[in-house]
Amino acid sequence: MPLELATADIGPTRHRQHNYYAPDKFFIRDETGRLMNRYRQRVMLVPEDFIVSYQLALEEEVGDAAAEIMYRCGYEWGKADIRGFEKRFEEEFGRKMSEAHSQMALETWWWPLQAAGWGAWSYDFSQLKDGLIFVDLFDSAVAKSVGNIGKVVCHYYAGMFAAAFGHIARNELSGLEIQCYSMGEEFCKFLLGSSKRINAAQFWAREGATAKEIIARL
């Protein structure tokens, strides 16, 4: 089934509306009533209580292992999503994702997630030569729902970012949240890099190091 996007006339030329949001055009229901986004991805509308209850139930069931489980779920989600996006990108833009500017590809990948309520982001490649990528996340769906509980909670995002950035870089990456809205911060911050660097950062985080201290030690 070919991808169908809304179009608009700009001067004498008709263009596809790529990263364009209107509720009645972004969210659609199929013939069975399932809610989909414009890219034919299944979505759900859930209240904050659902997110909080899911998080707490998992922690009560498996304890400290919950963070790793959520990270792995996020990683698999990100891996599947970026692979699907790679196919959609070529269909939508008529060129391979690998031929496009990496930042254009990343923004186009994240846009539907932001439109669906997963938050806004910015990323920092200034230390890429050292093998490090930083991602700032604003209005995390998880952290905003959970509130200030004094610890990081956005493990899904950490895994998802590691998978997506790693796929685009053609290099396996690991991820770690080093600052979170649920710790009283204004936004969440994630560190992406090799498993060795992330393991070191994770050790320092467990010892109580702040995001600034972790970055300085790296």
Residue ranges and their predicted role:
Residues 154-170:
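Active-site helix/loop of acyl-thioester processing domains in fatty-acid/polyketide metabolism
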Residues 1-134, 139-156, 174-218:
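N-terminal accessory segment detector
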